[in-house]
């Protein structure tokens, strides 16, 4: 007797209105989630394109074999620049990564990694450097190249590395090698190379540089 009797028709209408309201509320709160569109990656820069053309992918086992074989070949014949280059690439990743972190810590280093400048006859006006005063670094650099009949275009391409940015760091190291010779006033004979390798080893931490500095010294003979 406490419940008021409800007319069946009115009860049906009330239930229908309730269901309609609930459905509308659910539809209003349901949002359509669209799949994120893939952002196209920027095209590779000129250095990365060149590196990918020359790259030779190797497994870790192959990397170890190349490292051991190239080190032995370089010991037997220090003039095997191809073996020295292979040794540097297969053993130098930790040191190159440390160099990259150090470069990223400065504005100048970040700019170099972003622009990836090269040092060769296509990017540097050697004639303009030669025309500089004799006491200038640019003039002395060209004088060193001409005196020893070498060219910055002779540096080997990086092949046995995976990371293009680390490959650039290795390329940068190779292209400034003759600049170090110029600063130190060292020739390209065994004594000069050993001296340069010690400076490079202490500044880069590359195992190949330490190997060249230590084992190269054993090949020096008194005159």
Curated annotation (Swiss-Prot):
One of its GO terms (biological process) is ubiquinone biosynthetic process. It catalyses: a 4-hydroxy-3-methoxy-5-(all-trans-polyprenyl)benzoate + H(+) = a 2-methoxy-6-(all-trans-polyprenyl)phenol + CO2. Keywords: Lyase, Membrane, Metal-binding, Mitochondrion, Mitochondrion inner membrane, Transit peptide, Ubiquinone biosynthesis, Zinc. Transmembrane segments: none annotated. Residues 21-43 are annotated as: Disordered. Its cofactor is Zn(2+). Pathway: Cofactor biosynthesis; ubiquinone biosynthesis. It is found in: Mitochondrion inner membrane. Residues 1-26 form a transit peptide. It is a peripheral membrane protein. Coiled coil: none annotated. InterPro entries: Coq4 (IPR007715), Coq4_euk (IPR027540). Pfam families: Coq4 (PF05019). GO terms for cellular component: extrinsic component of mitochondrial inner membrane. Component of a multi-subunit COQ enzyme complex. PANTHER family: UBIQUINONE BIOSYNTHESIS PROTEIN, UBIQUINONE BIOSYNTHESIS PROTEIN COQ4 HOMOLOG, MITOCHONDRIAL. Belongs to the COQ4 family. Lyase that catalyzes the C1-decarboxylation of 4-hydroxy-3-methoxy-5-(all-trans-polyprenyl)benzoic acid into 2-methoxy-6-(all-trans-polyprenyl)phenol during ubiquinone biosynthesis. This is Ubiquinone biosynthesis protein COQ4 homolog 2, mitochondrial. The lineage of its organism: Eukaryota, Metazoa, Ecdysozoa, Arthropoda, Hexapoda.
């Amino acid at each position: 007797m406490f419940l008021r009797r409800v007319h069946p028709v009115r009860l049906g209408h009330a239930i229908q209105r309730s269901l309609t309201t609930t459905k509308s509320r659910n539809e209003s709160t349901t949002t359509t989630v669209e799949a994120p569109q893939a952002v196209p990656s920027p095209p590779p820069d000129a250095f990365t394109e060149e590196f990918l053309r020359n790259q030779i992918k190797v497994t870790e086992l192959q990397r170890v074999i190349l490292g051991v074989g190239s080190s032995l070949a370089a010991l037997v014949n220090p003039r095997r620049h191809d073996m020295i280059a292979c040794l540097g690439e297969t053993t130098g990743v930790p040191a190159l990564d440390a160099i990259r972190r150090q470069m990223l810590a400065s504005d100048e280093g970040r700019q170099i990694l972003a622009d990836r400048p090269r040092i060769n006859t296509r990017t540097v006006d050697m004639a303009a450097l030669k025309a500089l005063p004799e006491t200038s670094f640019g003039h002395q650099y060209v004088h060193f190249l001409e005196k020893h009949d070498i060219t910055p275009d002779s540096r080997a391409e990086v092949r046995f590395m995976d990371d293009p940015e680390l490959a650039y760091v290795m390329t940068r190291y190779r292209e400034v090698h003759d600049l170090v010779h110029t600063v130190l006033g060292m020739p390209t004979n065994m004594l000069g190379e050993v001296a340069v390798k010690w400076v490079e080893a202490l500044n880069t931490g590359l195992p190949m540089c330490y190997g060249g500095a230590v084992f190269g010294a054993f090949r020096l003979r008194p005159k």
